[in-house]
Amino acid sequence: VFSTGRIDADDPVLAYLQAHILPSLEKAGGIAYADALKLLGKAQLDAGAHDAAFKTFTRAKSAAPMPRDETAYAAFIQKQINSVTAADYQDATGDRSEQPVLIVGFPRSGSTLLEQMLAGHSQIASVGESPALRNLCQTTGMRSLNGADMVAAIRQIPPTAAQAFSQRYCAEIKGETDAERVIDKSLHNFELLGFFAKILPNARIIDMRRDPLDTCVSCYLQPLSAWH
């Protein structure tokens, strides 16, 4: 209903939600209460009551906050900024294939629209949000969101391993297609670009960008998962 349906102000389900479901869930709180609030917020958005909707979504997020270690995440990014340079890619020995195309960026930035437009070309295919690159990183022993591991992988990967990893990734996303370009739209691959560029130096990366205010408001008003 968030993406495809419209909730009318006179919808009996909405009336029941407000009169019975929300009061019964409020005391316990948690995910069920948060989901009910998000549904109410969606109805308020559809009715044009934007201020009320924003307050309702804020209540929903407070009812079921998503844990996040911002300090650890910042350290993961900063470690790469401080340690990795262009010189680390001068001897990139991975596969020279130009077939893979990554689309990365924020949710709600227009990435799906771009993917659909590109995939309309006869020589471009898409595998959607593939876990292939993240799975590949895990096989190297790289810990998730660990800056030191990422830097070590970029600097120390042997040429034979780089070739093997790149060919494995290409084979997984290619599947049965003969398209010249294959799109992988797993947005969180932006966290793995350092490794990706090392094993596939000729592959394209599209960084989707939308006005930051529009993007953040859109994300705030969507029922995004904790993954995002």
Predicted regions span which residues?
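Alpha-helical solenoid repeat scaffolds of the TPR/TPR-like class and their adjacent stem/linker regions
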Residues: V1-E176
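PAPS-dependent sulfotransferase catalytic domain
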Residues: V127, A132-P158, E176-H228
